[in-house]
Amino acid sequence: AGRAVYREANLYRAMEQLSHKNYKQVVKSVETSKEWPENLGVGKPYDNMIDNRLEDYLEAKAAAGQGDSRKTSALLAAVADYTISRSHFESGNLLSALALRESGKVQEADHMVAAWSTDFPENRVVQWCTAIYRGEKEKAVGMLQSRNDQTNTTPWEASFRDSNFDLIVRLFST
């Protein structure tokens, strides 16, 4: 839990700095969020097991703000090329779709988003991500307001927790 809080705090700081167009501080906070300090109780997993799409997406936004198109393209490509799980949906998939669209691969991004609704028709996170992708901010806000409503699931049915969702909600609510 310690490492997760450390990462989230640094990413929230990066988002705050991004809203103030303080791009150097965004990069610094993102780099810090990628660290795995030993005293936070968990060891670093293998690199291929780490989902850095949010960090890379924030860093791409900072690079774009600094006018570094080469770095922006490389970071967006890293976000877009992340291997997406077919067994469950992660809100980071929204970042992959946006990275594709921002890289000029609009059809591929649109196809990805359309597949979400087919593969996960009842998933509220999918519905929220689709609304954000399509620019339907009011619809997305309405979905968040009903987010804490009781659902008819038991604890053992809700086995997957999307640890990036709150961070991604924050990114698109600023």
Regions found by a protein language model. Give the residues of each.
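Terminal, low-structured helical/coil segments at or just beyond the last alpha-helical repeat
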Residues: 112-174
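TPR/Sel1-like alpha-solenoid repeat signature
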Residues: 13, 17, 62-63
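Structural motif corresponding to the intra-repeat A-B loop/turn of tetratricopeptide repeats
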Residues: 20, 66, 103, 134-135
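"A position-specific structural signal for the A-helix of alpha-solenoid helical repeats
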Residues: 5, 11-12, 51-58, 93-98, ...
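Solenoid-like repeat scaffolds
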Residues: 1-4, 31-50, 77-88, 114-122, ...
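Eukaryotic tandem repeat interaction scaffolds
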Residues: 6, 20, 52, 85-101, ...
